[in-house]
Amino acid sequence: MSTLGFIEYDKASPEVRAVYDDIMATRKIDKVTNFWKALAHDPVRLKRTWEDTKEIMSPGALDALTKELIYVAVSVSNQCDYCIAAHSAAARKKGMTTAMFNELLSVVGLTNANNRLVAGHQVEIDDQFKAVG
C-alpha cells in the first residue's frame, strides 16, 4: 500500500481531476495508474510531474521506444519495481522484444559492474574523452 494511499478519480479535487483527464486522454487509457493516484496528495507536484513526463517522454531526438528502454534501464539500476513493470509494459507496446529486454539487462549489469570498477580504481578520464561533451 502506498504511504498515503491513493486518490481515486471520484474523490479527487477538480484540479487533480483535470490532470487525471489529461493523463487518460494523452495515454488513451480509461483509468489512471497508481503512481499518479499516489502523487495526487500534492496536486502541484502531480501536475508538474505529469507535464514533465508528457513533454520528456514524447518523441523527439530519441524515439518513444528508446526513451522507454532508457527508463527501464534506469529503473532497474534504481530497483524501482513499479517503474520496471510500468515502463517494460509501455516498451513492449512500442515494440520491445524479449531479446531486446534481455540485452538491455545485460548492458545494465555490465555498466553497473564497470562503473563500480572505475570508481574503486579511481580511474582518471582520458583526454580523448574529456573533449566529448
Where are these regions (language model features)?
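Hydrophobic alpha-helical segments
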Residues: 1-133
